[in-house]
Amino acid sequence: MKTGIFYAVGVGTEPLDLTLRAKQVLETAEVLVTPITRAGEPSAAARIAEQVVSFSGKEIIPLLFPMQKHLDYRERLRGELLQPVRDCLQAGKRVAMVTLGDVSIYSTAAYVQQVLEADGYATEVVAGISAFSAGAAKAKCSLCERQESLL
């Protein structure tokens, strides 16, 4: 029986952007998945989260996602890349993957969540503050008003 739960967690663009929900999920997670673009380099999303939530005592699983065109993430995720995450979920653990900004906008965590859900695991998406929203706020700029469309 697949008893663990996977959370895809948006951490915003800076520590003060971390939502209360994201903080709560990261604090209670037993395992943290941190996306990296190069082996041996720290995760930008983890650096943000770590300034708000202690990673002490948590199992850390770095997942390598090189920034390359034409890379089929879903195929890699269906293979052995996610096996350590699946093992933790099979053991009933709470697993959270951090991602910059919001999970729903150009996020590897969204691919991971979709693959794990298709595999039958319980998943949840925790929204974060997107870069364009944070940027507009810093610039004191309204992105759309009245009848205008954002898209």
Give the ranges of each region predicted by the language model:
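Class I S-adenosyl-L-methionine
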Residues: 1-122
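Class I SAM-dependent methyltransferase SAM-binding "motif I" and its flanking Rossmann-like core
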Residues: 101-151
